[in-house]
Amino acid sequence: MGSLSIWHWIVVVAVILLLFGRGKISDLMGDVAQGIKAFKKGMKDDEKTAEKPEPVKTINHNADGSGAARSDTGSKVI
């Protein structure tokens, strides 16, 4: 009772074909194929952007302290 025979599968396929028709099923399969192609293209685009290294950023430091953060020692604190 738990297993489905070949006749069960034939009836299921026949009902699906009657409900959706041949045209709708082929359109659906075409849409699925387009979705898979778009997904694969997106994955390739992500790999291409991941392969490009970002340029190295340098930070200029001055030994005399110019350009360093200011201190507000001259302001009054009340």
Curated annotation (Swiss-Prot):
Parts of the chain that traverse the membrane: 1-21
Cross-referenced InterPro entries: TatA/B/E (IPR003369), TatA/E (IPR006312)
Membrane topology classification: Single-pass membrane protein
Keywords, ordered alphabetically: Cell inner membrane, Cell membrane, Membrane, Protein transport, Translocation, Transmembrane, Transmembrane helix, Transport
Top-level taxon in the UniProt lineage: Bacteria
Biased composition (Basic and acidic residues): 43-55
Family to which this protein belongs: Belongs to the TatA/E family.
Record's function text: Part of the twin-arginine translocation (Tat) system that transports large folded proteins containing a characteristic twin-arginine motif in their signal peptide across membranes. TatA could form the protein-conducting channel of the Tat system.
Protein name as annotated: Sec-independent protein translocase protein TatA
